[in-house]
């Protein structure tokens, strides 16, 4: 028996081949698209209904997310208790969520119970009644969660950064406040439901061990005839971005034990030709444990337990965001070091060894992200909601493999603009030497 030499690191092998299973499109009789991803050997199915309307389509805060959340609270045939009991009996799990531009209904179920569980889920979407009593309970629960979250400095900093970048009249900069939980009425949810939850505004994904009978079952419940208010027209809306002129904004939280930092500015849209290679640069800068920010600010200086940078994408734009939490006395030093690492990438080429390490990390991350049938659903739902072409994953792979140190230097010089970043610090008001900074304070 050969003994393993643990003093020698295992050899790193190049990823020779990587491909993502393409979904097969089935067009239902009522025109709804069903994307089938047949993979896996277990008799378990994941079903996703994607509603192409979200927070960008609402007329007031909380309307989209509460409409989605209330689907499981009662239909014309079942109460919320009966819905929960039936799903539990069949061993199914239901998840409801809402994003900037979409709502999601996700069901995990055993294949042998698919017909029964699909009947329940179809009833939730097609026959919701939005009972007033359940609505008030949901409001109270979410109001309490809002109050708890509003004590967290990371939440305060994240919200303020979007307010500063987009403006409070833009839906991406407008967050629900305490009074919005009092103002929202069930009639607003019914209005959103009738305008957006219909067969002409939805698509479906099914993954797992998908058989022809699974497809027929889905068509029976969803695709035989149009459902909902299919005559409702979706109004495309636009908003002006009103960026805060201030460089530094401080959100005061007097009892905070530490401060939260968010630095951010507008960056490239996912469809920009430089976007995929910029992702490599941002990963190297602050997107993994061995990044420049982690190596300097965590490992070398010890200012924080963790710091990261990433591209946060929204419809039509994205943000370059740096985030961390640290003791109040270290915050100025952290900001200084962030800019220092940006300058290094703008001035010096990335060493070949470091670039190779980032390549291997990103390629490995892609393999982990898309190795299972259910994660493939996430991948292709992402493609639809982001409005990307099906070759996005192949293009991502090519960008990671082909980007050079010269290209990264050029990208840093063009897109790492310190002047465009807004600094948001949530925590105690700084004292001493920090007061010399021209910092404007926002009281939470």
Residue ranges and their predicted role:
Residues 1-8, 27, 82-233, 250, ...:
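Charge-rich, well-structured scaffold segments of protease-associated domains
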Residues 2-45:
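N- or domain-start disorder-to-order transition segments that initiate the globular core
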Residues 32-53, 60-61, 201, 229-291:
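His/Glu-based metal-binding/catalytic segments typifying zinc-dependent metallopeptidases
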Residues 55-57, 71:
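N-terminal cap/recognition module
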Residues 62-73:
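Active-site SXXK
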Residues 294-295:
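Phosphate-proximal small/polar/acidic motifs at interfaces that engage nucleotide phosphates
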């Amino acid at each position: 028996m050969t003994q393993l030499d643990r003093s020698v690191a295992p050899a790193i092998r190049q990823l020779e081949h990587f491909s993502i299973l393409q979904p097969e499109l089935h067009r239902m009789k009522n025109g709804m698209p069903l994307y089938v991803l047949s993979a896996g050997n277990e008799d378990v199915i994941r079903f996703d209904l994607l509603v192409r309307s979200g927070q960008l389509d609402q007329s007031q805060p909380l309307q989209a997310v509460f409409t989605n959340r209330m689907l499981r609270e009662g239909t014309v045939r079942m109460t919320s208790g009966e819905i929960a009991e039936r799903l539990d009996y069949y061993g199914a799990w239901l998840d409801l969520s809402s994003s900037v531009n979409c709502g999601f209904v996700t069901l995990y179920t055993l294949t042998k119970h698919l017909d029964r569980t699909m009947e329940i889920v179809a009833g939730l979407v097609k026959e919701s009644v939005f009972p007033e009593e359940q609505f008030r309970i949901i409001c109270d629960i979410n109001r309490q969660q809002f109050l708890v979250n509003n004590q967290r400095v990371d939440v305060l900093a994240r919200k303020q950064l979007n307010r500063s970048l987009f403006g409070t009249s833009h839906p991406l900069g407008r967050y629900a406040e305490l009074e919005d939980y009092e103002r929202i009425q069930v009639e607003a949810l019914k209005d959103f439901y009738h305008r957006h939850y219909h067969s002409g505004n939805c698509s479906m994904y099914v993954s797992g061990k998908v058989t022809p009978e699974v497809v027929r079952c889905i068509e029976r419940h969803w695709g035989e005839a149009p459902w909902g208010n299919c005559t409702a027209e979706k109004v495309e809306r636009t908003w002006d971005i009103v960026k805060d002129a201030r460089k530094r904004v401080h959100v005061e939280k007097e009892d905070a034990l530490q401060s939260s930092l968010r630095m951010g500015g507008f960056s490239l849209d996912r469809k920009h030709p430089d976007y995929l290679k910029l992702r490599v640069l941002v990963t190297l800068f602050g997107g993994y444990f061995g990044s420049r920010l982690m190596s300097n600010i965590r490992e070398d200086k010890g200012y924080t337990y963790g710091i990261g940078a990433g591209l946060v994408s929204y419809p039509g734009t994205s943000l370059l965001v740096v985030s961390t939490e640290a003791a109040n006395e270290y915050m100025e030093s952290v900001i200084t070091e962030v800019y220092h690492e940006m300058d290094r990438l703008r001035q010096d080429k990335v060493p070949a060894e470091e670039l190779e390490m980032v390549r291997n990390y990103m390629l490995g991350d892609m393999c982990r992200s898309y190795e299972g049938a259910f994660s493939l659903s996430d991948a292709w739902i992402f493609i639809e909601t982001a409005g990307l072409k099906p070759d996005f994953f192949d293009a991502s792979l090519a960008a990671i493999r082909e980007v050079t140190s010269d290209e990264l230097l050029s990208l840093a010089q063009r897109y790492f603009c310190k002047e465009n970043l807004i600094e948001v610090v949530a925590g105690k008001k700084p004292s001493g030497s920090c007061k010399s900074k021209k910092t404007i304070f926002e009281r939470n």
